[in-house]
Swiss-Prot record:
Belongs to the small GTPase superfamily. Rab family. It is found in: Late endosome; Lysosome; Golgi apparatus; Golgi apparatus, trans-Golgi network. This is Ras-related protein Rab-7b. It comes from the Eukaryota. Pfam families: Ras (PF00071). Controls vesicular trafficking from endosomes to the trans-Golgi network (TGN). Acts as a negative regulator of TLR9 signaling and can suppress TLR9-triggered TNFA, IL6, and IFNB production in macrophages by promoting TLR9 lysosomal degradation. Also negatively regulates TLR4 signaling in macrophages by promoting lysosomal degradation of TLR4. Promotes megakaryocytic differentiation by increasing NF-kappa-B-dependent IL6 production and subsequently enhancing the association of STAT3 with GATA1. Not involved in the regulation of the EGF- and EGFR degradation pathway. GO terms for cellular component: Golgi apparatus; late endosome; lysosome; phagocytic vesicle; phagocytic vesicle membrane; trans-Golgi network. Signal peptide: none annotated.
Length: 199
């Protein structure tokens, strides 16, 4: 029996102020609704261990502050991340419109910069009745960007686990592809090189 592989992944969650990033993260990691609203200054980090595709994943999830004045500081946390959740509030059209800026900012800062960087979009607060962002508009935007979309509620724990685990699965695939490419590159031999002989 093979021992289960272990992989550490760094995920980030970004979006405008007040969309519920911290509540989503607490619901996923602790199965509790984070009722007390406090602005995240900079970033906070929570970890969760899950088993996915016979691999033990240690997810280090960075909850970033959504205030404009912290954006330049927060963007330094994007470096080295393996995947990103773009969150918005379905009752706040401006938070949805800001997703382009958040997405572009993440893609500009990740290292290494590449197009296959996994992202998922979460429309939070579907438990509220005053929805202002239609599903059709969001689905169109996500289809154009080739990103999965989840309608979620941190308060009622709707689709939260599924969304995080789809991102984790995509990040794992990317990680495995990167690790495989490094292995292939490191074992390539140049043909025709003479071997040195001793005595």
């Amino acid at each position: 029996m093979n021992p289960r592989k272990k992989v550490d992944l760094k995920l980030i969650i970004v979006g405008a102020l007040g969309v519920g990033k911290t509540s989503l993260l607490h619901q996923y990691v602790h199965k509790t609704f984070f009722e007390e609203y406090q602005t995240t200054l900079g970033a906070s980090i929570l970890s969760k261990i899950i088993i996915l595709d016979d691999t033990t994943l240690k997810l280090q999830i960075w909850d970033t502050g959504g205030q404009e004045r912290f954006r330049s500081m927060v963007s330094t946390f994007y470096k080295g991340s393996d995947g990103c959740i773009l969150a918005f509030d379905v009752t706040d059209p401006e938070s949805f419109e800001a997703l382009d800026i958040w997405r572009d900012d993440v893609l500009a800062k990740i290292i290494p910069m590449e197009q296959s960087y996994p992202m998922v979009v979460l429309g939070n607060k579907i438990d509220l009745e005053d929805r202002k962002v239609s599903q059709e508009v969001v689905h169109g935007w996500c289809k154009e960007k080739d990103m999965p979309y989840f309608e979620v509620s941190a308060k009622n724990d709707i689709n939260v686990v599924q969304a995080f685990e789809v991102l984790a699965s995509r990040a794992l695939l990317r990680y495995q592809g990167t690790a495989e490419n490094h292995l292939i590159d490191s074992i390539k031999l140049s043909p025709g090189q003479p071997k040195s002989r001793c005595c």
